[in-house]
Amino acid sequence: MLFFPFPISHFPFPIYSLKSEIRKQVLARRDALSAVARKSCSSLITKRLLVLDAYRSANCVMAYATFGSEFETGDFIADLLAHGKKLVLPRVERGSRVLTLHEVQDPRLQLEAGVWGIPQPRADLCPVVPASQLEFVLVPGVAFTARCERLGYGGGFYDRFIGGLASRPALIAAAYSVQVVPELPISESDQRVERVVTESAEYRHTA
């Protein structure tokens, strides 16, 4: 459990301070998982993702390359490529505040270390894909609630990306159960996901 001496709604400091503290605590819990535990949990999460109707019917899927102790996306990506789906991965140019979307056919050969060392598509090898083609988006994040509220890494990239979509694809987050918290401080610009999938449960946002 996160430790706060009083409810989030009564937190006496700016919201960004609270978000920063939650990130710190949740990332520490995630990082404390052993490699074996992360692999096992990731396998269970992947199995849940692959049977979702939204995934099975999608032809164009946006995912992300795993960084640090995140959910391991490798098996999910391998499955979508094996089934002939278009794989889209995000790219961030240094100094930019937006994600650009690129089709990746072979992650082993077409990725490079980007900003903060996160693997991303090589712009010279991977064509740009318009967001309008996306049917399923796997959304990363640090913390989530059972109401599908999301806390990202602090850059606002996915909040801006999701908020700017003209039409909404399925927005699905994959996370370990240690990343699910009772509540999160929410700003006007924060974007929910449609579903949060963990190794032991699934949570859906209902309007």
Pin down the residues of each PLM region:
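N-terminal active-site beta-alpha-beta segment that forms phosphate/nucleotide-binding
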Residues: 15-133
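Internal, well-ordered alpha-helical segments in soluble enzyme and binding-protein domains
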Residues: 22, 45, 157-158, 192
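Redox-cofactor binding/interface segments in oxidoreductases and associated redox assembly factors
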Residues: 63-65, 139-140, 198
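Proline-centered helix-kink/hinge sites
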Residues: 7-9, 90, 140, 185
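Surface-exposed, charge/polar-rich loops and edge strands
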Residues: 2, 28-31, 107, 122-123, ...
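Arg/Gly-rich low-complexity intrinsically disordered repeat tracts
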Residues: 5-15
